[in-house]
């Protein structure tokens, strides 16, 4: 995500390195590079020009303190303007209705149905909501089935009427059902099309008018670049939606949609989809995204993800075992499962300042965990609890059973031993008390 743009911007700032002061000439040269980087990232031309004009005005209007290098000042100004470009403040959902109603809109293939499931799961687990998903796509039985399957996976009820061809009435009936059965949130998934057409827009306009939703969200595939921006403009003219959801932001996207949409439609990005898993959804924070674009990482989001997986009782149990030097392969396996829940490894690593650039061309394979899991699952319960008994014969058996090599088994045992020693050191220090404090 944004790897190429980050690299290009870093190269642009190097023009100012070694300069004693900011001048019209070196600012113009730097911003020419910045504008080209933005355009190559598929940012809207007017947005890119307006952005660099603002940065130029602010850069030339400031006196550089002797302690601040011109290149550092430029990074600061660009960071602030990128944050403003993407909305400035984090945009929250406003859900005041009883039940609160969220209407989903967007083209077919944008990830609208999957996002509906992700959002239902997020609001259920984080906000203690009781959601009802509503299938209003009367044209594609597969879409109704997809929502039903998602509902089963996240344990959320799905309302559908297989014999009805009236999406407006289905939505109204669903809200009536929600009131009767105590649901406090209704998420309405509507039909999409491969392209905008009058029938589609009339239909979703009618649904919105009938149900008067608290929030209307426009879901768009970020990989479609400027097409995403143009589609957002047309939907906004008809629906006057409240916010944008960018899906597939983890893919090979140049980032143009994320940097253009806020300015073009004057509506905030509220959420981003960052993977296929049902927990791969993040609230959109403009300042944090600016950090990541400029290669500064995103430690806050990384800590938040860790906190979501943090189990205080499990941590206390583990801490006692580590203190007694009883950390075993069952605990090791449990830690791997927690890390996997946080997201894919490359994305997590990119949130650490300075690491994103270093790993850009490195293939970090999430399947690496699979061989570790296979080795541990090939151990007997006694071997997992007492790794010290793993002699040569046992290691050979484990390698055969897991489809790995003796070398891989030995490597894992060495890593496990190092992990156990490191954890014992951490538990005995103040770091062992950090996560509970963060939780508070």
Predicted regions and their residues:
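Conserved phosphate-handling catalytic cores of large alpha/beta enzymes
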Residues: 171-175, 183, 195, 199-209, ...
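Residue-level recognition of specific faces of alpha-helices
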Residues: 1, 15-18, 37, 47, ...
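Amphipathic alpha-helical interaction segments
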Residues: 29, 33, 50, 54, ...
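Short, small-residue-enriched loops and turns at beta-alpha junctions
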Residues: 109-110, 139-141, 165-167, 192-196, ...
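Residue-level signature of catalytic and energy-coupling elements of molecular machines
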Residues: 16, 42, 78, 107, ...
